């Protein structure tokens, strides 16, 4: 099967963006500027990353591969941190969380023999793991901000009665973690029925037997 990007496919892709812009403008959602900037950034970033990955795959260097993974994790942590305006050391917390989840998962996959430590496998998988972690952490941060604002008085009363900061904040933290994990859990429940894993979809497009 020959898959190629042509002017017609690019035109129809652009039309999808136009539809989103029309809806945003008509319903006064305030997303018009964000959509335009996001699309422009996506195009520039994908083109740049395409050339960069082509070079990295050809060189097949251990240090360069690790640097690419570090860049992915750092960028994911930076974007997750922006979801909370109140959290101190948000970048560091996000970096450690995303770095640990990515490192542990990659380590298990390598030692189990599922993948090899080569750029063409490590970098895409690291990106998928870091992306999922970034979304979960971002949701958690946003929910933390909202709940602390709404329940500020209740938390202050608990502290006044002698509760520790951790104890007074525990229900809010638990609820925020649940909110952050909900999309991942829902995706896991419906995998294979509603959606296919990104890597599996890519292999199917490449003509590999789904089984």
Language-model segments: residues:
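Structural signature of hydrophobic alpha-helical transmembrane segments
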Residues: 3-16, 58-72
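Loop-to-helix entry region at the N-terminal start of transmembrane alpha-helices
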Residues: 5, 9-13, 64, 85-140
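Alpha-helical membrane-inserting segments
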Residues: 19-23, 44, 48-56, 71-75, ...
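C-terminal ends of transmembrane helices
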Residues: 21-33, 75-86
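Loop-to-helix transition at the N-terminal end of transmembrane alpha-helices
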Residues: 30-61, 67-69
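Short cytoplasmic-facing helical segments at TM-TM junctions of multi-pass membrane proteins
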Residues: 143-176
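Transmembrane alpha-helices
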Residues: 166-197
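Glycine-rich helix-loop "coupling/hinge" segments at transmembrane-helix boundaries
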Residues: 191-211
């Amino acid at each position: 099967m020959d898959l190629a990007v042509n002017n017609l496919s690019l035109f129809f892709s652009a039309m999808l963006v136009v539809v989103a812009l029309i809806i945003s403008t008509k319903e006064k959602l305030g997303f018009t500027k964000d959509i335009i900037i996001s699309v422009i950034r996506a195009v520039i970033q994908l083109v740049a990353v395409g050339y960069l990955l082509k070079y990295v795959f050809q060189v097949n260097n251990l240090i360069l591969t690790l640097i690419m993974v570090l860049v992915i994790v750092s960028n994911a942590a930076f974007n997750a941190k922006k979801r909370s305006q109140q959290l101190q050391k948000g970048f560091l917390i996000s970096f450690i969380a995303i770095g640990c989840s990515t490192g542990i998962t990659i380590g298990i996959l390598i030692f189990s023999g599922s993948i090899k430590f080569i750029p063409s496998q490590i970098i895409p998988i690291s990106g998928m793991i870091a992306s999922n972690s970034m979304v979960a952490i971002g949701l958690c941060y946003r929910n933390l901000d909202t709940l602390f604002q709404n329940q500020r008085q209740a938390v202050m009363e608990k502290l006044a009665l002698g509760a520790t900061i951790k104890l007074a904040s525990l229900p809010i933290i638990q609820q925020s973690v649940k909110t952050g994990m909900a999309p991942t859990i829902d995706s896991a429940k419906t995998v294979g029925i509603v959606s296919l894993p990104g890597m599996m979809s890519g292999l199917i497009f490449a003509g590999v037997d789904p089984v």
